[in-house]
Amino acid sequence: MNTEATHDQNEAQTTGVRLRNAREQLGLSQQAVAERLCLKVSTVRDIEEDKAPSDLASTFLRGYIRSYARLVHVPEEELLPGLEKQAPLRAAKVAPMQNFSLGKRRKKRDGWLMSFTWLVLFVVVGLTGAWWWQNHKAQQEEITTMADQSTAELNADKDSGQGVQLDTRAAASQDTTPAETAPAAPVDSTAAATQNTVVAPSQANVDTAATSATATETSSALPTDQAGVAAPAADSNALVMNFTADCWLEVTDATGKKLFSGMQRKDGNLNLTGQAPYKLKIGAPAAVQIQYQGKPVDLSRFIRTNQVARLTINAEPTSAQ
């Protein structure tokens, strides 16, 4: 009779109440239970108050209650009915597996990446080609402009040269006219003297031979003097240029004088002399070979870039800026 009453009384008590009563009978505090079970004091308090924390899974809560029961010597079988009410097992929600292929997604992503890569490559190639074409076009326009300027300057020089030649010829004709009219009087006087004076034939022959010999000596002496004047000493600061193809160029010395400006043909050569340093503009650097003071001038950096060469040749040998 008493056993049945005790059993009914135990069933009336909840799990938390039974664990608290057993703890108090053993003289343990909530802090001591929490330290032995390695739990928080708040967790022990929730178990004794029959609370199920929302952030705690039911599986862990049931394990904590069983450990608490073993600690205070309460049979686990007596707590099972209360555990079902306090910490019921919750069915885990399993999300349905998506029906897709990982390989297909990866292939699709790789396809987009490859398309973007090709697009970037095409843009880079297009911009590079446009830049090269603009640069090439600008160089051609610059060469054409310089060639037109040099042609206009050459035409102006030719016109001025023709005017100087015409003036020189006019002056020469004016100077020659008195010289041609002057010998008229001696002819008349010579004729008169001839009428009054008879010259011996032998004397006339001697005078004629002497005159012709003197003229021969004079004419033979003239080329020697002219050759001596026409052979000046070579200038050490001269620029020597040989052309392997058609090339436009302009050469200016330190005084600003244009030594040459125009087009040179294939297999042509130039020998220019002026005051150093020289400033050069060369339309096709690969078509010309330059020597200064007997040493070649390096144009390789202009040939590699295929640009119009603008350089200054200093007084030092083969130094170009």
Curated annotation (Swiss-Prot):
It is a single-pass type II membrane protein. Residues 19-71 form the HTH cro/C1-type domain. GO terms for biological process: regulation of cell shape. The keyword Membrane applies. GO terms for molecular function: DNA binding. It holds the Pfam family RodZ_C. Residues 167-190 are annotated as: Disordered. One of its GO terms (cellular component) is plasma membrane. It is found in: Cell inner membrane. Residues 1-111 are cytoplasmic. The chain crosses the membrane at residues 112-132. Keywords: Cell inner membrane, Cell membrane, Cell shape, DNA-binding, Membrane, Signal-anchor, Transmembrane, Transmembrane helix. Residues 30-49 bind DNA. PROSITE patterns: HTH_CROC1. Residues 133-321 are periplasmic. Cytoskeletal protein that is involved in cell-shape control through regulation of the length of the long axis. Belongs to the RodZ family. This is Cytoskeleton protein RodZ. The gene is rodZ.
